[in-house]
Structures are given as structure tokens and as C-alpha cells.
Amino acid sequence: MKTIEIIGYRRANLGKQASKQLRNDAQVPGVLYGGKEQVHFYTPMAILKDLVYTPQAYFVTLNLEGAIYNCILQDIQFHPVNEVILHIDLLQIFEDKQIKMDIPIVLVGDAPGVVKGGNLVHKKKKLSVVAYPKDMPDTIPVDISGLDVGQMTRVSHIKAENYTILAVPGTPVAVVETTRALRAGAAEAEGKGKKK
């Protein structure tokens, strides 16, 4: 899996006023947990853009004044009005412990139903996955090359190697729906067949 490096600094002052001052200085307060102790830190807001505003999933290398931590983005809080990042939580990861992440789904192939005029609907964009860090996939490929109009692919059709998908097996991932034009064409063809 791809990794993004975040450079941060340990926080000396904790509390609302200190956090507010950090945000005014375009810094984002955060907490690293999952290791021996919680580490409070802050990082420039601009550094977080590639991690937060993307559909991709990443591992994070957190560099706190020379100390390196491998982690993942666990939680993020946004301002309710202007979508500014208010706070981030990072979870430290270890090679011998499984982690849970939301991994994006990538549709692979061309659905014959789309060629016939159907509409491909991507029902799920991400799935929660549990795996050891070395086995965590960048994306979950889903083959749609066999989907005709009215057919769908489900979570149960995904071949997961070395990871577990946390979703109901019957959950639809992608479906080729009938469009109005396709229904109208079918009704028109049926009407012509009855007139003969």
C-alpha cells in the first residue's frame, strides 16, 4: 500500500485554547494512539490535503521531531460549515496486528449491459477490510465484464486474498440498470410484435 509522510511536532500545551491557537496558525491538532502511550501532536494543514481529500487509502509515516511512527488515519473532524480540518486521530500499526481500513473499489472490465444501453451504477465505493499491514490491498478490484442489463455483482463475488471483507455477502457492489430509453425501446418492440 502507498505511504504518505506527515511531519508533525509534539504539543506542549493541551486544551481548547491551545487547539484554537493552532488552528488559527493553519495547524491541525492530532492524537496518535494504539502504541504504549498517546502522543499529542500538531501538523500543518497543507500536509494533510493529500491524505484527506482523496478516495485512495494510505499508510501514514508520522515523523515527530525525528521519531518515526507507522500508522493509519483513524478519524478526522471537520468544521460543520467550512469543512476545515479540526482534528485528526492516527492509529499506530504493527506488523503482527491486524488493522481495519476502508479500501476503495475499482471496477474492472466493460459490462456488456452498458454496451446494450444499460446504466452502470457503482453501489459501493469502499469496503471495510481487516488484514495485516503487509496484506492490506491498495484497491479491491471487481470484475464487471459479465454484467448484462439487470444483473449485479455482490460482495460475495469478490475474491479476497489474505484479507477479510467486513460486509454482508449479499451487498450489491455494481449493477447495470435498465434505462428509460431501453425500456421504451423494449415496449415499442413488444407493441410492434402484437400488431402483426
UniProtKB/Swiss-Prot annotation:
It comes from the Bacteria. Keywords: Ribonucleoprotein, Ribosomal protein, RNA-binding, rRNA-binding. One of its GO terms (cellular component) is cytosolic large ribosomal subunit. GO terms for biological process: translation. Disulfide bonds: none annotated. Pfam families: Ribosomal_L25p (PF01386), Ribosomal_TL5_C (PF14693). Gene3D superfamilies: Ribosomal protein L25, beta domain (2.170.120.20), Ribosomal Protein L25, Chain P (2.40.240.10). One of its GO terms (molecular function) is structural constituent of ribosome. Belongs to the bacterial ribosomal protein bL25 family. CTC subfamily. Part of the 50S ribosomal subunit; part of the 5S rRNA/L5/L18/L25 subcomplex. Contacts the 5S rRNA. Binds to the 5S rRNA independently of L5 and L18. This is one of the proteins that binds to the 5S RNA in the ribosome where it forms part of the central protuberance. This is Large ribosomal subunit protein bL25. It comes from Amoebophilus asiaticus (strain 5a2). The lineage of its organism: Bacteria, Pseudomonadati, Bacteroidota, Cytophagia, Cytophagales.
